[in-house]
């Protein structure tokens, strides 16, 4: 049965954060989503559909033997019932909602009610026809009430009808889970499924942790204007991809001969695959050479190019690892971040760039590569690190966190050459932090978290040219320790974000006032989504006019970039000019 919900407060929460003279962030609306299980509630992403509405993707947990199988919206029970799981954990269900940008109200809902998803390897990407593509890493739960070892996944479409993913052969069974497979679904503008594809991987049975149940991580998804689909990640055995002629493209991993089968091990090889608009294999871009592991974490599409970022580590420094003949100069002692671009016509690499890793004070380094965004001819990388980045072949870090706690970072590179132009590493507190994406205007706003519960979800304002920090404000706290942020959406001057915390309420800050939002209880996680209108005052003009990088760039009295020949008063390099 189709059912509509108004997600929270809408226009009633038209409150304003005047955090400083620079940033005015007006709260348009906020709402919460959660299951009633102790785990399994996570924000994933917000995207904009072709018709201007939003698509919001979350994960929520259900556990039928505990009476917690129903989804809650704004802390009230709904009729949406998740997987019939009776084990000692929970079933992680997918939740996809088409919402109004005006107030966050729900236009329709799609959700899963059979099969467990890994939200870190599940994604949504809008298509030009008004629909979207969704991918899910899914596996069956042996303890599910209705377990069927040929049934992988089930989705309730927007009209209330079910769509089942059933396989021709039985799934390999572990003690509690089946093997995982990657499901690709094409939805139309009305929330109905047009087609489905399943990418299975070879399950290894002659290894210590047999059988290997998770053999491929599909880490990233994007689409182009023609409906072509791009997927990327890491595979550790063989990956089977359907082709239009009813044959199968097989990708064979060459570096995991000694793999134990533990899904947490760093092993396997990267892949980027192009599928046509019907979900069939077209082409691929793979790694060559020897490595301990290589992985693609993020991809973005723009003007016939696919941009990507990932991590790699060699077995020995003398090993050669490359993509399309261009080397990834990864370290054998520290994981290394790399990025590049390729033509979508032939999937040939334009450039590959490597960032040298600089160890922290304990001689180690961890990189969490959260997001890649293409905007205004620049690439913006966000994540967290507990070491530093240096130019390839150098040892002096241009961005560094010398401590052992992970800290959020933002890097900016030229999208044509790949050259790094600016960097920033969060240093505002002693807690763990991370950034998950950016809003790009005359300034940059990075969204992320500071695990200090008094700070929570933050917006950090950066100078667009230098990435020098101007201010950091908290937009949601007293929600436990926030440690997960949704991939955000920029829609003009609107920034739609989400986070996960644990507490009876989330406190959305508004200057000296607070706006508590009821979200579950202290015994389970809750997810909050918030829409903000971002505006900057005239004080930004002074900084915008004093650096060499700003030469010949003109601003009006409101601090907005304008054509130098525009009529009226313009400010160039700190001087006012009157054009008649």
Segments predicted by a language model, with ranges:
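A short, compositionally biased
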Residues: 178, 334, 405, 546-551, ...
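Sec/Tat signal peptide C-region and signal peptidase I cleavage site
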Residues: 17-21
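A glycine-anchored, Pro-Gly-centered beta-turn/N-cap motif
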Residues: 52, 566-569
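A sequence-level/structural motif corresponding to short, flexible coil/turn segments enriched
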Residues: 22-538
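Bacterial N-terminal signal peptides
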Residues: 9-16
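Residue-level detector of functionally pivotal "anchor" positions at catalytic/ligand-binding pockets or at interdomain
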Residues: 534-558
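C-terminal tail/sorting-segment detector
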Residues: 2-3, 28, 283, 569-580
């Amino acid at each position: 049965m189709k059912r509509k919900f108004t997600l929270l407060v809408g226009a009633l929460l038209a409150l304003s954060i005047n955090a400083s003279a620079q940033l005015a962030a007006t709260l348009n609306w906020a709402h919460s989503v959660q299951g009633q299980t102790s785990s399994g509630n996570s924000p994933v992403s917000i995207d904009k559909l072709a018709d201007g509405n939003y698509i919001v993707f979350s994960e929520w947990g259900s556990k039928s033997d505990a009476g917690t199988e129903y989804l809650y919206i704004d802390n009230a029970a709904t009729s949406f019932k998740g997987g019939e799981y009776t084990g000692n954990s929970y079933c992680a269900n997918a939740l996809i909602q088409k919402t109004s940008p005006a107030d966050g109200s729900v236009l329709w809902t799609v959700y899963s009610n059979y099969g467990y998803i890994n939200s870190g390897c599940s994604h949504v990407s809008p298509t030009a026809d008004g629909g979207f593509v969704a991918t899910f890493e899914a596996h069956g739960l042996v303890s599910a009430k209705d377990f069927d070892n040929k049934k992988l996944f089930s989705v309730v479409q927007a009209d209330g009808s079910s769509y089942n993913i059933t396989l021709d052969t039985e799934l390999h069974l572990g003690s509690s889970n089946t093997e995982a497979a990657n499901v690709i679904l094409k939805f139309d503008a009305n929330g109905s499924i047009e087609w489905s594809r399943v990418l299975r991987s070879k399950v290894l049975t002659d290894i210590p942790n047999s059988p290997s149940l998770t053999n491929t991580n599909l880490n990233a998804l994007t689409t182009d204007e023609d409906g072509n689909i791009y997927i990327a990640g890491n595979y550790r055995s063989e990956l089977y991809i359907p082709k239009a002629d009813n044959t199968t493209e097989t990708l064979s991993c060459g570096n995991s001969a000694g793999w134990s089968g533990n899904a947490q091990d760093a092993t396997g090889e990267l892949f980027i695959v192009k599928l046509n608009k019907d979900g069939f294999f077209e082409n691929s871009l793979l790694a060559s050479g020897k490595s301990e592991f290589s992985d693609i974490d993020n991809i973005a599409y723009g003007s016939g190019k696919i941009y990507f970022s990932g991590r790699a580590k060699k077995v020995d420094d003398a090993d050669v690892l490359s993509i399309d003949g261009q080397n990834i100069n990864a370290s054998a002692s520290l994981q290394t971040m790399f990025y590049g671009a390729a033509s979508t016509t032939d999937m040939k690499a334009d450039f590959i760039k490597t960032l040298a890793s600089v160890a922290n004070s304990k001689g180690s380094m961890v990189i969490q590569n959260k997001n890649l965004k293409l905007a205004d001819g620049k690439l913006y990388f966000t994540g967290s690190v507990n070491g530093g980045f240096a130019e390839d072949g150098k040892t002096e870090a241009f961005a560094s966190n010398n401590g052992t706690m992970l800290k959020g970072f933002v890097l900016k590179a030229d999208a044509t050459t790949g050259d790094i132009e600016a960097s920033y590493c969060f240093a505002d507190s002693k807690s763990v932090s991370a950034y998950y994406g950016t809003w790009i205007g005359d300034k940059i706003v990075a969204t992320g978290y500071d695990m200090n519960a008094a700070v929570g979800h933050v917006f950090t304002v950066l100078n667009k040219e230098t990435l020098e920090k101007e201010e950091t404000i908290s937009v949601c706290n007293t929600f436990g320790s926030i440690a997960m942020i949704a991939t955000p959406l920029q829609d003009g001057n609107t920034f739609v974000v989400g986070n996960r915390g644990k507490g009876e309420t989330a406190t959305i800050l508004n200057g000296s006032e607070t706006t508590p939002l009821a979200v579950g209880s202290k015994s389970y996680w809750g997810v909050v989504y918030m829409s903000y209108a971002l505006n900057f005052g005239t004080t930004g003009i002074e900084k915008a006019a004093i650096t060499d990088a700003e030469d010949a760039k003109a601003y009006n009295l409101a601090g907005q970039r304008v054509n130098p020949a525009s009529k009226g008063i313009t400010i160039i390099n700190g001087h006012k000019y009157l054009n008649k």
